[in-house]
């Protein structure tokens, strides 16, 4: 078993989005065979690029306010919201608040970037 605080994992800048950083809190290094758990921080005014990929996402909003684009619509986000993004669906997360938008994102191990 591995138990630790998420801040014990190094915060890394996202490669294709300014103002977006993440921690891979559970993944290949921990010998997780199926899934990767990541914690994202999106700075105020920042967003991920609109993009698609072959794997799904499961997201849980921890703090902050924002919106998610997906399936041709936008939805406002706040703590406690959950989001399912199917594979190959264009999507984007944007921070619309004045504090960090923080969320947990689960993906299959095969989707780890």
Q: Which ranges hold each PLM region?
A:
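A short, N-terminal "cap"/entry segment at the start of jelly-roll beta-barrel domains
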Residues: 1-34
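Conserved short histidine dyad/triad with adjacent acidic residue
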Residues: 38-53
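A generic "binding-loop/recognition-motif" signal
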Residues: 46, 54-55, 73, 89, ...
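Histidine-centered metal-chelating micro-motifs
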Residues: 47-49, 67, 83, 87-93
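Glycine- and acidic-residue-biased ligand/ion/polar-headgroup-sensing regions
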Residues: 55-66
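Short acidic-glycine-tyrosine-enriched beta hairpin
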Residues: 73-87
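Ligand-binding loop in jelly-roll beta-barrel domains
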Residues: 87-112
């Amino acid at each position: 078993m591995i138990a630790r605080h998420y801040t014990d994992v190094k915060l890394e800048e996202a490669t294709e989005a300014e103002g977006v950083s993440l921690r891979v809190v559970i993944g290949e290094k921990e010998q997780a065979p199926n899934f990767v758990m990541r914690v994202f921080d999106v700075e105020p005014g920042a967003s991920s690029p609109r993009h698609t990929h072959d794997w799904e996402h499961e997201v849980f909003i921890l703090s902050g306010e924002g919106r998610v684009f997906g399936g041709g619509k936008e939805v406002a986000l706040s703590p406690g919201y959950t989001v399912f993004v199917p594979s190959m669906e264009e999507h984007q997360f944007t921070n619309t608040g004045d504090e960090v938008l923080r969320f947990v994102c689960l993906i299959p191990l095969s989707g780890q970037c």
